[in-house]
Structure formats: C-alpha cells, structure tokens
Amino acid sequence: MTDLSQHTPMMQQYFKLKHQHPDQLMFYRMGDFYELFYEDAKKAAKLLDITLTARGQSGGKAIPMAGIPFHSAEGYLAKLVKLGESVAICEQIGDPATSKGPVERQVVRIITPGTVSDEALLDERRDNLLAAILGDERLFGLAVLDITSGRFSVQEIKGWETLLAELERLNPAELLIPDDWPQGLPAEKRRGVRRRAPWDFDRDSAHKSLCQQFGTQDLKGFGCQNLTLAIGAAGCLLAYAKETQRTALPHLRSLRHDRLDDTVILDGASRRNLELDINLSGGRENTLQSVVDRCQTAMASRLMSRWLNRPLRDRAVLEARQESIACLLERYRFENLQPQLKEIGDLERILARIGLRNARPRDLARLRDALAALPDLQNAMTELEAPHLQALATTIGTYPELAELLAKAIIDNPPAVIRDGGVIKTGYDAELDELQALSENAGQFLMDLEAREKARTGLPNLKVGYNRIHGYFIELPRVQAEQAPADYIRRQTLKGAERFITPELKAFEDKALSAQSRALAREKALYEELLERLIGHLAPLQDSASALAELDVLANLAERALNLDLNRPRFVEHTCLHIEQGRHPVVEQVLETPFVANDLALDADTRMLVITGPNMGGKSTYMRQTALIVLLAHIGSFVPAARCELSLVDRIFTRIGSSDDLAGGRSTFMVEMSETANILHNATDKSLVLMDEVGRGTSTFDGLSLAWAAAEDLARTRAFTLFATHYFELTVLPESQPAVANVHLNATEHNERIVFLHHVLPGPASQSYGLAVAQLAGVPSPVIQRAREHLKRLETTSLPHEVPSQQSGKPASPMQSDLFASLPHPVIDELSRINPDDISPRQALDLLYAWKMRV
C-alpha cells in the first residue's frame, strides 16, 4: 500500500478505501460530484469520453482526476456496466458542517455486471445472471442467481462440453470460478469471468450460509442436499451478492434444483442456428421470439425467453399449458386479460429492488398501480376453468391492505428519487404534514401572528420579523416597549426599538428553522418504514409476480395462436414426428408472398430424410421450420402447422451454415467437423438432427465420404434426421438403409430462368440448378456460358457412384485416401476406375483432352 504520510488527509482516506477495492473503479463522492483519481480517472476518461484533469497535488505529485455529476451518474454507470466494469460507490456519510477533517465516507454499494439491479442499468427484456462453477473435468457444480428476481438455482453437470453448452444458454453477465483453477480453462474464454478465493467455495460454510439465508435446518427440502459441488458454488454466489449489495437479501428465499434430463438440450451451435432470441448478427429482429412474443409485461418476455431456451420434456406440464392456451382462446378470453396485465408492469424486478432496499419512489407507485389492478384481473379469471389457470389465479391473489397503504402513502406521480422529498402524500403522517406546512407556510404564520398580537396588545406598530443572526422576533418602538405583555421576553435592543420573543414564536422558530431538513429526514424515514413493511409481504408478492408472468405468457401464446394461425400439437407415446402443412413462423412473417407449407413424416419405419434440391429452393427453411415446430411444442405452445403429432425428443441438433473461428484457430471446415462430431457422439434415437451440406468445406471426394459416413451413422442411431445435401450420390442411401427416404424441393426452368416452387416432394431431385441460381445472383453471362461447357464435359466424364459395400462388419476400402495420406494424382485415380468397354470413342477422346489439360 502507498505510504500515506506524504498525502493530504483526504487522499489518505481515499487510498484506504481504494485499497479495499482494487479491482473496481471507485466513484468517490465530493459534494455534487463523483470523482475518480489516478488510474481509475485515466480509465474512466477513456471509457466514458470525459475530461481527464490534474488538479492539486498530493505526495508531491499532481493528481489525475476525472469527475461526473452525481445526479447524472446513472448514464455513466450504465455504460461502464455494459463494458463489463465494476464500480464501488463511495458516499459521504458524515455531515460536512460538523466534520473535523475529511468528511467520513464509506463504500455503500458495489455495482457489477452480474449484480446490478437499477432499472436504468438493465435490459428489461433479458435476464441478468450471475453464475459460479466448482468441480473438475468430470463433474461440475453450477449455481445461477438472478438478483433482479430472486431466482436461485443449482445443478450438477458432467463434462466440459455439457457445461459450456449450459453456460451458453444462460449467458451470465458474470461467472465466478475458484482462483486455484489452472489458467486457460475453456470457461475463461467467456466474458465477465472473476476468480474468487478457494475458501469462498467451501462446502461446509456454503451449506451453513444457505440454510441461514433460507431459514432452514438443511437443504433437503430443496432437493439438493447431496449436490456438494453445486452447494459450494451457490455459497460463493451468496457471499458475492452480499458483498456487493451491502444489505440483507430477503428476496432470495429458496434454491431450485435444475435437471438437464427434464429439458430438451440444445447446444450452442443449435441455439445460434435456430435464432431463438438473438439473430446471427447479434440483434433481435427476425428471431423466433420477435414473432411469438407480444407479452404485456417485461417479466413475461423474460420468462418467454427462458422457455424458448429451455424446452421441457415433461408431458404433463406441456399439456397443462396447451389446455390453458385453449381455454384462453375460447370466446377470445385472452382479450379481457391482456389490458389488465399491462397495468401490472415489471413486478418481479420492482419486488427485488424492494428486497434490496434500493427501490425508487416510482417503483412503489408502479407496485401501487399493479396491486390496484389485481381485483379486476381476478374477476376476469373466475371463468377460466383450466386447472392450471385456476392454480395461477389462487397464487396471484389480491392485497387490499397493501394497495390501500400505498395509495395513502405515495403521491400520484412521484419524483424519480427520494433524495429531495416530495414523495409521501399529505395526510399520511401528521408530523410530516406539520413540518411541511411550517416550511411552506412560514410567511402566512408570521402574518397571522402579527395580526393576533396587534389585536391582543392593542399596539398598532408591532411587527413580526426575522434576521439570520437572532432569528424570529416581535419588534416594538422604544416608546411602546414598556407596554409589552409579561410573556414577551427581551431578545435584542436597538437604537429606536426593542425586540422580543414569545414562547409561541420560540416554538415556531425551533420548528421552522429546521423544518425543511427535518421534513426531508422524516420523509426518508417514512419511506424506509414503508419498504420494511413491504419486505414483510415479499414472499407472497414474489409468488404472485411469477404467476402473473406465466399468465401473461399463456395469454400471449393464445393471442399468437389466433393471429398466426397456430394449432395445438398432440404428444403421443409411440415414436413419430408428423407435420401437416408446416410453416416457418419467422420467414412467413417477412415474406411478401404466401408461404408454401409442407408436410413431414418420420416414424418407426422412416427415421431420416435425405433432402436434395437447388440452392435457394427452401431446404434450410424446411429443416429449420421442423426444428422450430418441435421446439414450440416442447414449451407448450401451439405450432405453425395444420396438424402436428409427435413424441417427446431429448435433444435438438443443427449443423447448418458455415463460419470460421479465427480467434480459436479453427477453419470453417474444422468448425463444421467439430459440430458434426458433437452430433455423432451425443445423438440418440429420441433426438432431432438437422444436417445441412455436411462436407462442403473440403474437397469433393473427402466431403462426400464424410457426409456419407455421417448419414449412415445417424441412420444406425435412428435419430430423427433431416439431411440436406448437394451430393446426389447420397440419394442411394435408402437402398442400404431401410429407415432412410429421399425427398426434394422442386423447381423449374422457364426461358433459362429458374422458378422455385418450394414444395417438398418424394424422391431425389432431378438436377441442382446451380448455374441458374448463379445467373440469378448476377454472375456474368460469359462465366455462366463457360460453366455450362465445363458442366457438360464433367457430366459426360463422371460415372455413377455405387453404394460402398460393407462385409463382415469391416468398413469398405475408401475410394479416396484420407486427408493425411499421400494422394495419387486425380487423373491416375480416375483412369484406374474406367472400363474402356463402357465408354464411346467420343467420350474417350473428351476424357483424353480433359486429362491433358489437367496434367
């Protein structure tokens, strides 16, 4: 630590506080500004684009300094948090008027990306999560906390691959890991990783602190007593939350045990490819959520996002949601609920801020309005006969006493902060009313007092006045001073007058001179009392908020079902996936022409479709719409299809699109093969697999061989598979794999122009129309013409491929050496496979010229 003796007392105070928070930017309150010093100032000036100055000296050197007005700090804090920075807020807690030396200061709060709760610093439509992990490469404990809602969950996960997929789903703003873990682990590639002391993860301490937080003897009631790794991680999260918030956390009331087996698992690549709530460009436009989310409240939109990213495999839960949506669709009942739900607002985060004791006056006003809306909402729910909706109505309840309390306490349109008062309603507290009246009506009181005293004493020259030194007084001319009543106490003698004070005026003075500051202090005390009273009701209010969010999502899904023409899917026990007139919910919304719906049939006999057809013909759309229909069914939603019958799936895999990973040193082909390997290792006979153009990132024979082998492996696994390819050779797979069938997307050519019909038809495609697509894309005509010449020659010289045989369980000899073998010249390879008796003299001559050019 710096030698403090060379510094000014104020800077000594700063260094002591900064030493306790070396990793955070310190906002150091000085009057109306938050100041930053030294390296903090330099960093903040760069990040916030504010002026860096050097004012004064301490320790013989100029002090680098940057400052921001405290009343506009929110905008700067929001920017810093978005950039991943943490900020320690250091406030003046002493009174400058009475302080000897520097005003006493202390850090009252630490704002970090994962623990921020201020409305202005959060994205209202996304969860803001804090996570911690503990374990080794075989088994990990994962704990996740949303401090803005109170949701706190744990789970144990096997292996890095599954853990990283779960972290990608959760996308925590901060991730805590033990400091004794080796450097360079896969988890450290994520943003917001913080290393914490190993003892923060101590399981015994964690168990004790968690039981203390929840008021329980043990954790058996939460179903996680034996999850020792996850409990250690949860204890670290709880300690970190308390350290940053500097207050009790009454809104953290329970621990939920999440199980991956209860969900449909999507890996990171599948989540990205399906564009559930984030598109491939990182935005929200044209995502599944952008189409299916018309929720009335932000908390419901966040719940919808959680549902989309964590589909369920619990048939009872899914069918209860379906039944609820059907009930809300009857007689358009959702239309009665949605306007009332809009009045509820973001109750979930409001209650969390109340629990953290940093709720703003407008939070309480919104809570007041929400509670006032509940009785009408309850009345509207009485006719909803679906059991799940009835359970939600019971949980929601009403809170007439709290509604009345807030209606009496908070003015209609309160200011943003309590700092300057003006929040508590007149009539709520007699003492506050009196103090405010004194402050606001001092002039009128003095005029009334003067009139009364003139009448009482009969002295017409009597005056009531005030000066800053002597305070309030009654002044009489010297000649009338002797006639002053006995209760007049002499205060000051002037040349031509005497000044007096009376007990009544003295009492008024005591009140009036401090009325404004006392009124503000009283108002703040009443506000704190109000928060404490609300905290006493936090548990049922939070349960109500959760139920309201779910009701909002279900009403939204009913509205979407009506307006997007969605229908109820049916879950069955036997293995199948039948879709009639299925549509892509997102593409359908952006098309200016009607979307071409298509069928799909997979069952015990047919487990894989090999899909061929032209580029832009709709293969990827067809595959993605299938995955989205299955996913929507697994959140309990209705689906974009005339009819859908399906069995539960355990995973959805997608290998679609191409991109490299330059930062990770992986080529496009390596990324493609990594994703393919993940699918081949983890797909089961209950999985849905989408494979698009596997093998296109390498040479033709390598790519074809890999695609062929991958398709055969998936056929043996019996996963539901849609395998789109331009390798026409793969259309012979059904001959060796009975569970495989061919379908194609049709197109036609008219006047040398391609027309995509987008219909899925049985059998393989007759041609790929690649040159027509290239022409449509604007490739120059001479290039197209030359390509036709090459195509004609290649079609003449190429030979049909036979299905490689497999005997005695051994793989057939490859037609081409593997990537790392010494390759023969392609011409020699082709020559070795030609039977001269099978080709015409003209074909032989063409081949000879072609080989001559290539050699």
UniProtKB/Swiss-Prot annotation:
Q: Which InterPro entries match?
A: DNA_mismatch_repair_MutS (IPR005748), DNA_mismatch_repair_MutS-lik_N (IPR007695), DNA_mismatch_repair_MutS/MSH (IPR017261), DNA_mismatch_repair_MutS_C (IPR000432), DNA_mismatch_repair_MutS_clamp (IPR007861), DNA_mismatch_repair_MutS_core (IPR007696), DNA_mismatch_repair_MutS_N (IPR016151), DNA_mismatch_repair_MutS_sf (IPR036187)
A Pfam match: MutS_IV
Return the SUPFAM superfamilies for the record.
DNA repair protein MutS, domain I (SSF55271), DNA repair protein MutS, domain II (SSF53150), DNA repair protein MutS, domain III (SSF48334), P-loop containing nucleoside triphosphate hydrolases (SSF52540)
For the keyword ATP-binding, the answer is yes
Q: Which domain of life is it from?
A: Bacteria
Q: Which residues bind ATP?
A: G613, P614, N615, M616, G617, G618, K619, S620
Q: Name one GO cellular component term.
A: cytosol
Sorted UniProt keywords: ATP-binding, DNA damage, DNA repair, DNA-binding, Nucleotide-binding
Q: Name one GO molecular function term.
A: mismatched DNA binding
Region listing for Disordered, in residue ranges: 795-816
Q: Where is the composition biased (Polar residues)?
A: 796-816
What is this protein's function? Answer: This protein is involved in the repair of mismatches in DNA. It is possible that it carries out the mismatch recognition step. This protein has a weak ATPase activity.
Q: Which family does it belong to?
A: Belongs to the DNA mismatch repair MutS family.
The protein's name: DNA mismatch repair protein MutS
